[in-house]
Amino acid sequence: MTVSRETDSQPGFDAENPALRLRTVCLQNGLSVTDVQIAQLARFVELLLEWNQKINLVSRKSANEVWRNHILHSISVLFVLELQRGASVMDIGTGGGLPGIPLKILRPDLTVTLVDSIQKKVKAVESIMNELKLVGIEVLCARVEDMPKRKGLRASFDY
C-alpha cells in the first residue's frame, strides 16, 4: 500500500485537484475509479462540509483536508483487504458517514450499515445518502452495545 500522510505543501499532493490525487493513489494500489465515482465522492465532500457548518461531523474543515484525511483514509481498507463481493459491512460510530459512504461509492456491491448514537448525525447522514441517491446502505441511530439486541442484526455482518 502506498498511502502516505501528505500535507498540501509536500510534493505529490495536488492541492488544486485532490480528486485527481485520489484517483492516482487508487490506481497505484490496484483500484480503478470511474468518473462517476469521483463525482459522487466530490459531491459527498461538498455535502459533508455543508453539514459540518451546522453540526460537528468531521474535524477537518477544508475540502483538501477532507479528501486527504477522510476520503483517502476511508477507502484505504480497499487497498489491503479483499472484501468479498456483496459483503455486508458495518460502520460503527460513522459520524459523517465515514468510512461507510466512500466505501459504498467505490464498492456499490457492498451492503453497508452505518451506526451512530447521535441522532443529529444520523439525520445529517440520511440527508447526504438521499442526496447522493445511494442504495444498499442504511443508517441506524443506536449504541453499539445495543446492536446484538436489534432483530436481524446479530452476527449478520461480514466486516
Each model region followed by its residue ranges:
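Class I SAM-dependent transferase core
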Residues: 2-85, 90, 127-137
